[in-house]
């Protein structure tokens, strides 16, 4: 399977599918945040501040997370490569930390409840993940392990001619589409939004579970390989996410979110 990562080029400037995926994900999350904030707690100044901070958090956190966790040697020897975000190489875990810091800073500055904001953001984030994984698929990166299944694909970046799981599409479905449906269904149908931080906890926990399971079909990063107990780096990073999500959810059950006194 070989798809061009470039949508089109105008002179020396190229527009990449991967970059477009990030832009569309952020635009959707921004629009969806407006839609979910039916109490109009957020002001225009807060939206603008949050959007700017989140974009910076995603780019810096995602890129630095990938550089420090997955391939520090390469980027130390070729630091200019750190700037080439359009070629892929973004860490969800690093990006999540960047977004968290962005939300905390923006909420503190505008006196907006942090977990209320995180809950609403958690409802829209899976669509960004879905689009990002499709971008990975188009780039032909983060491919799966060798398989004999009829839907196996050959990825030129693997350096061989073997059929592999299209694990990027598995992640797009489980970490993106399915997570979006489940989290939003719980948010609306089970009144989870009445419990401060519950949606955030569930989203973090379910993402960790989905990522841990899909990693069994994804080829480990060549520079890292398998680690403790034959697990991948992605799986090891997902374990604390699952535990953290559970703690946030259980903690939220003890502090019911009163929508009439949200401040």
UniProtKB/Swiss-Prot annotation:
PROSITE patterns: LGT
Binding site for a 1,2-diacyl-sn-glycero-3-phospho-(1'-sn-glycerol): 133
Compartmental location: Cell membrane
Residue stretches spanning the membrane: 6-26, 50-70, 85-105, 112-132, 169-189, 197-217, 233-253
Keyword annotations of the record: Cell membrane, Membrane, Transferase, Transmembrane, Transmembrane helix
Family the UniProt entry places it in: Belongs to the Lgt family.
Protein species of origin: Wolbachia pipientis subsp. Culex pipiens (strain wPip)
EC number(s) on file: 2.5.1.145
GO biological process, one term: lipoprotein biosynthetic process
Protein name: Phosphatidylglycerol--prolipoprotein diacylglyceryl transferase
Signal peptide: none
GO cellular component terms given for this protein: plasma membrane
């Amino acid at each position: 399977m070989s798809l061009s990562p470039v949508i089109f080029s105008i002179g020396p400037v190229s527009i990449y599918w991967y970059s477009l995926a990030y832009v569309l994900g952020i635009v959707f999350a921004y629009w969806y945040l407006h839609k979910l904030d039916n109490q109009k707690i957020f002001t225009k100044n807060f939206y603008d501040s949050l959007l700017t901070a989140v974009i910076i958090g995603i780019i810096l956190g995602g890129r630095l997370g990938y550089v420090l966790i997955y391939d520090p040697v390469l980027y130390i020897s070729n630091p200019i490569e750190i700037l080439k975000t359009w070629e892929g190489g973004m860490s969800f875990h690093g990006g999540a930390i960047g977004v968290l810091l962005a939300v905390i800073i923006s909420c503190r500055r505008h006196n907006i409840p942090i977990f209320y904001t995180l809950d609403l953001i958690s409802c829209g984030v899976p669509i960004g993940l879905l689009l990002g994984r499709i971008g990975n698929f188009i780039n032909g990166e983060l491919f799966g392990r060798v398989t004999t299944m009829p839907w196996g694909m050959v990825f030129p970046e693997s350096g061989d001619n073997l059929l592999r799981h299209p694990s990027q599409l598995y992640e797009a479905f489980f970490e993106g589409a399915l997570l979006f449906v489940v989290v939003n269904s719980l948010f609306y149908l089970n009144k989870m939004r009445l419990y401060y931080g519950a949606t955030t906890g569930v989203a973090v926990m379910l993402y960790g579970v989905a990522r841990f399971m899909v990693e069994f079909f994804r080829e480990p990063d060549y520079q890292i390989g398998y680690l403790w107990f034959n697990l991948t780096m992605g799986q090891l990073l997902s374990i604390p996410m699952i535990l953290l999500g559970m703690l946030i959810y259980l903690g939220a059950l003890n502090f019911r979110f009163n929508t009439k006194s949200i401040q």
